[in-house]
Design a protein with these regions (language model features):
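Bacterial N-terminal signal peptides
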Residues: 1-8
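N-terminal hydrophobic or amphipathic helices/low-complexity stretches enriched
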Residues: 11-47, 84-86, 91
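A non-catalytic alpha/beta surface segment that caps or lines the substrate-entry region
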Residues: 32-85
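Extracytoplasmic/secreted envelope proteins and their assembly/folding machinery
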Residues: 34, 38, 52, 56, ...
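Sec-exported extracytoplasmic/periplasmic mature domains
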Residues: 42, 60-65, 121-131, 155-162, ...
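Structural recognition of the beta-strand scaffold that forms the well-ordered cores
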Residues: 81, 93-97, 136-139, 166-171, ...
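Acidic/histidine-rich catalytic neighborhood of metal-dependent amide-processing enzymes
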Residues: 102-197, 203, 209, 213, ...
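Active-site-adjacent substrate-binding region
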Residues: 177-279
């Protein structure tokens, strides 16, 4: 996460409504619990050279077959991609992503193993669930070097194909505090959706304006794709992110779990809505 300033956040709640808010059919989801989320931080890969293979192994544990996982390389940047084809080929695509790289210091547990864990568990929840839209799960490389992975992916979308992309959900640095939306890195309608979903799920939620900050959502916003960044930082982030202190000990598993539940429900609501609803 490229950050300079962030607004205060509220205290993270220790519980959340355990039922997906979208009702019918939700029981077919494979929902993770906070203990399962927390277990993913028992062994965080601390070297960048280990991260991509660790991401692949995580998705395989979540049920992905080796044949479903693609490593897409453009200009020396590697992104891990899984495409889940929707039942309605003309209903559009949703990207859900998180960068897997880290800075040299620390283990990058908050920034951004938390995001990778979130999208992997969202994948498991939806793996056998029938969706309308095609969902593209992406672990982006080289975000810390300038959003390189997401920029290369967004640059690869042909101009006449951009309307096929309904939304991009970016998860970056959950686990320090309450779930938040980065207003200045997000589309207004997706900001409103995140707020609505949080209220329905009774998840503590807040807004932040990240002055001078940047995230992978920007790469897609620049191409006209509705995008949102969800995070969970507090005002203590400068003491943790990009330092030796960014370790699993700084991750609140409940906070990551709440972010996971929010993102999963957001994705499902986008899936059940026309693309135009979020543009």
């Amino acid at each position: 996460f490229f950050l300079l300033a962030i607004l205060p956040v509220s205290t993270v709640a220790q519980g959340v409504d355990n039922k997906p808010a979208n009702g019918a059919g939700a029981s077919r989801l494979r929902l993770s619990n906070s203990d399962e989320i927390g277990a993913e931080f028992d062994s965080v890969p601390c070297a960048n050279s280990d991260r991509l293979n660790s991401v692949k192994a995580l998705f395989e544990r979540m049920g992905a077959a080796d044949s479903e996982i693609t490593i897409e390389k453009r200009k020396k940047v590697e992104n891990l991609v899984i495409r889940k084809t929707g039942s309605q080929s003309d209903s559009g695509k949703i990207i859900i992503g998180a960068h897997f790289d880290k800075t040299e210091k620390g283990c990058g547990a908050v920034d951004n193993w938390s995001g990778v864990v979130t999208i992997a568990h969202v994948y498991r929840a939806l793996r056998e669930y029938l969706l309308n839209k095609t969902v593209i799960f992406v672990a982006f490389g080289d975000e810390e070097k300038g959003l390189n992975g997401s920029r290369e992916m967004s640059d690869g979308i042909e101009k006449n194909s951009r309307q096929e992309y309904c939304a991009m959900i970016n998860i970056d640095s959950l686990g320090m505090g309450a779930v938040q939306v980065a207003d200045n890195l997000s589309s207004r309608k997706l900001v409103d959706l995140s707020k609505s979903v949080a209220a329905d799920l009774k998840i503590p939620f807040n807004h932040s304006n990240i002055a001078g900050g940047d995230a992978d959502s920007t790469s897609f916003l620049n191409k006209g794709v509705a995008s949102v960044t969800i995070h969970g930082l507090t005002n203590e982030w400068p003491l943790i992110l990009h330092t030796q202190k960014d370790t699993a000990a700084k991750v609140n598993a409940t906070a990551v779990y709440l972010g996971y539940r929010l993102v999963l429900e957001m994705l499902m609501r986008i899936d059940s809505s026309p693309c135009s609803a979020f543009r």
